[in-house]
Amino acid sequence: MSEMTPREIVKELDRFIIGQKKAKRAVAIALRNRWRRMKLNKELRYEITPKNILMIGPTGVGKTEIARRLAKLAKAPFIKVEATKFTEIGYVGKEVDSIIRDLTDSAIKMIKSTAIKKNKKRAKELAEERILDVLVPTIKNNWKKTNTNNNSEATLQIFRKKLREGTLDDKEIEINVAVTPMGIEIMAPPGMEELTNQLQSLFQNLTGNKRNIKKLKIKDAMKLLIEEEAAKLINLEELKKEAIYAVEQHGIVFIDEIDKICRNHGSSGPDISREGVQRDLLPLIEGCTVSTKHGMVKTDHILFIASGAFQVSTPSDLIPELQGRLPIRVELQALTINDFELILTEPKASVTMQYQALLKTEKVKINFTKEGIRHIAEAAWKVNESMENIGARRLHTVLERLMEDISFHASDHRNEITITIDEKYVQKHLDKLISNEDLSRFIL
C-alpha cells in the first residue's frame, strides 16, 4: 500500500495530467485516508468506511487517465471497469459481482508477483543446483571412462563459477519441468460463475502435476527453473488469505461510464443494463459479501471511484440510493487552448515527445517551435468547438494528420535530416482542412 502524502500524489499525477486540481486532490485525499485508517485501532478501523467519489466531466479531460495513474501509485489491488458491460442479475451478460472476483484475481497476481521477487534469490540457488545436477553426472561418467581421480567437489565449483559467469549459457541440456496447465474456457449461464471457476480448477489440476523433459539452452533453462522453484516456495493458502485481506482493506474499484447506466427518459420497458445495474451495484458499494474461488470477500471497506461525462444526463438521474453512496462529487473542467499547449509539452512522454522518439529511429529529427505548438493547440480547440468536444483525444487526431507526410517519407532519407514544425508548417497542413467543416468532420 502506498504511503505517499496527498501533496506527493498530486505532484506525481501532475507529471502526466494537466490541470484538474480538484479531482487530483480528491483522489489523493481518498488514497491517503486508506493509509490513515490502517493506523487506527481495530474497533475504530472497522467503523470508518471509505468516502466514495463521483468524477463528473466531459470526455477527454483526464478522468480515465487519473484512474490509470492512480493504479500505479496505489500499490494496492485496483481494477477499472466499464459500467456498460454489466447487466441486471438474471439476464445474459456480466453480473456486477464479477468486479470483486476480478479484483481478487488481480490481488492474487500482485501478491504472487511480490512473493516471487522476494524468493528470487533462494529460487536462483535451487535452480542452479538443478542445472549442476544435470551437468555434473556427465562429468562423473567421463571420469569413470578415463580412470582419472579428480576431486569432484573442485570440479563442481569450477562448473558453478562458469555457470554464474555465463560461459555455459549457450550449452544445451535436458531438464525435467512441469507442464503448464492448459486454459479451458467454459461458457456458463449468469449466476454460475463460481461453478465455472471450480470446473476450470478441476481441469487444470488434471494436468497440473504432469512433467516433461525439455532440451534447452542453459540460460533459458535457468529462467524456467527459477520461475518453477519460486512458485514452489510460495504458500498458496497464505497467499489467498493475504490477497483477500488486501482486497477488503485496500481495494480500489474505478467504474467508468457510469452516466451510461442512467435511465433513458424517452424509453419504456425494462432497462436491464441501466437501472437494474444501478440497483445491483448498491449492495456492492454499501458493503456485502461476495463469493470468489479464493474465498469470501467483504466489500465494506473497498473504495469506489465512479466517473462519467453526463452530457445527456445529470448525476441526479442516478437512482437516489446510488447518489447517496457516492458522497464526494468532483467536477472536471473542459480543456482550454492553454491546457492543450501544456499537454503537448509538459507531461512525461508527451505526444510530441513520442513522435520525436519514433522518427528518431529513422534518423529524422523533429523540432517543434513554441509558435507551432500554440497553433496545433488552437487547431485542436477550434475543431472541438465546431464539432463534438472529445477533449485531449483531439490532439492525437490533429497531430496524426500533421505528421502523416513526415511519417510516410521518413524511411526515404539515407542521411540524418531535421524538420522544424513551426507556425507556417502547421498552417500549410491544417488550416484549409479546419476551415472546410465538411472535410474536417470526416478527417479530424
Curated annotation (Swiss-Prot):
Instruction: Look up the coiled coil feature and give its residue ranges.
Output: none
- A molecular function (GO) term: proteasome-activating activity
Q: Where does ATP bind?
A: 18, 60-65, 256, 321, 393
InterPro entries per UniProt: AAA+_ATPase, ATP-dep_Clp_protease_ClpX, ATPase_AAA_core, Clp_ATPase_C, HslU, P-loop_NTPase
> What's a GO biological-process term for it?
proteolysis involved in protein catabolic process
In terms of superkingdom, the source organism counts as Bacteria
State where the protein is found.
Cytoplasm
Record-linked SUPFAM superfamilies: P-loop containing nucleoside triphosphate hydrolases (SSF52540)
Q: Name one GO cellular component term.
A: HslUV protease complex
Keywords, A to Z, come to:
ATP-binding, Chaperone, Cytoplasm, Nucleotide-binding
Identify the Pfam families for this entry.
AAA, AAA_2
For this chain, the family text in UniProt reads:
Belongs to the ClpX chaperone family. HslU subfamily.
This protein's assembly is summarised as: A double ring-shaped homohexamer of HslV is capped on each side by a ring-shaped HslU homohexamer. The assembly of the HslU/HslV complex is dependent on binding of ATP.
Task: Please explain the role this protein plays, according to its UniProt record.
Answer: ATPase subunit of a proteasome-like degradation complex; this subunit has chaperone activity. The binding of ATP and its subsequent hydrolysis by HslU are essential for unfolding of protein substrates subsequently hydrolyzed by HslV. HslU recognizes the N-terminal part of its protein substrates and unfolds these before they are guided to HslV for hydrolysis.
Quote the protein name from its UniProt record.
ATP-dependent protease ATPase subunit HslU
Organism of derivation: Buchnera aphidicola subsp. Baizongia pistaciae (strain Bp)
Q: Which gene encodes it?
A: hslU
